[in-house]
Amino acid sequence: MRKIVCLATSPWYPIPTRKQQVMSRIPDAEILYFDPSVTYLAPLKDKAARPGLSNYKKEGVHPQENITVYSLPPVLPFFYKFRWINKLNQRRMARFVRRKMREHGFTDVLLWVYSPVTADLVDLVPHKGLVYDCVDRHSAYGGLMDPTLVDRMELELAGK
């Protein structure tokens, strides 16, 4: 059975998006689906984000027999603005993903990513294939980001 590690930009629950639809329609693969991180500042802005600070410590959930969903650990904010922060965050996430891969006996995986920030992660997670499923223009979201940096990470990721 094929092994897929999916680093998503939207959580599996509560509202299914295209990412969940794609993964749920691959029946001949075992999938580790990782919900996105929250930043350490997120709960200050939105109290509903507070559980995101510790969700990564929970056991994985199984929305389907072949899919296990985990939450990624929280990250430092401003990763869309400062590359050095993104690199720190991605190293932390890569360690977490590698640990879950070991726990599930995952080798020779297809790494499936949705965010340009993973440009700093993909070389840290062993994989035999890479899919960058570009569904949004991330640099157009606005907010606390450097659009030039986000576009540069996206180009780097697309070239891997």
Question: What annotation goes with each model-predicted range?
Answer:
Residues M1-N55:
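N-terminal subdomain of nucleotide-sugar transferases
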Residues E30-L32, W112, D123-A140:
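Active-site proximal beta-strand in glycosyltransferases
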Residues P43-L44, S139-T148:
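Short, charged, surface-exposed secondary-structure boundary motifs
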Residues M93-A94, L110-P126:
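An aromatic- and histidine-rich active-site surface loop
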